[in-house]
């Protein structure tokens, strides 16, 4: 099984507002960069889309170390999702889970891979995370109102 490192980030101008996501995928010496955005979104949606898009870009099952500066993404997929599913995608206080379609897409995207999630402090000089942030801002650009 190939080993791939993935670094993701999301950005939003206003929250909600125009947003973007970025991802850097590294397999050995090979790197691939992905980015995209939406006109009206939130930072959490962009963080989720970065991870989903990166995992879906992998052509075969891989062992993945996924680095995110989003505690929301890390805690959601490693802790909260199990309870949400048990309760029919409801939170502890019985409210519908926000961004449920993205959580379901992230769960599906990681199913064929062996994913280990890592939280990194954002904007702390981590080169690949800084690059993912640049890509997220680039992905947001076309949607910003001038």
From Swiss-Prot:
Signal peptide: none
Molecular function terms, GO-annotated: magnesium ion binding; nucleic acid binding; RNA-DNA hybrid ribonuclease activity
Enzyme class: hydrolase
Subcellular location: Cytoplasm
Keywords, comma-separated and alphabetical: Cytoplasm, Endonuclease, Hydrolase, Magnesium, Metal-binding, Nuclease
Biased amino acid composition, Basic and acidic residues: 125-146
Positions that bind Mg(2+) 1: 9, 47, 69
Complex and partners: Monomer.
NCBIfam families membership: PRK00203.1 (NF001236)
Family recorded in the similarity comment: Belongs to the RNase H family.
Name recorded for this polypeptide: Ribonuclease H
Biological source species: Agrobacterium fabrum (strain C58 / ATCC 33970)
Gene: rnhA
């Amino acid at each position: 099984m190939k080993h791939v490192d993935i670094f993701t980030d999301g950005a939003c101008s206003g929250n909600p507002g125009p947003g973007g996501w970025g991802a850097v995928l590294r397999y050995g010496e090979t790197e691939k960069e992905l980015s995209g955005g939406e006109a009206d979104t939130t930072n959490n949606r962009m963080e989720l889309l970065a991870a989903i898009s990166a995992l879906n870009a992998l052509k075969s099952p891989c062992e993945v170390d996924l680095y995110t500066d989003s505690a929301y993404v890390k805690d959601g997929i490693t802790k909260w999702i199990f309870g949400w599913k048990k309760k029919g995608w409801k939170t502890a206080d019985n409210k519908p889970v926000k961004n449920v379609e993205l959580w379901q897409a992230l769960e599906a995207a990681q199913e064929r891979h062996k994913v280990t999630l890592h939280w990194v402090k954002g904007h702390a000089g981590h080169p690949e995370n800084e690059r993912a942030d640049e890509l997220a801002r680039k992905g947001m650009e076309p949607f910003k109102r001038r």
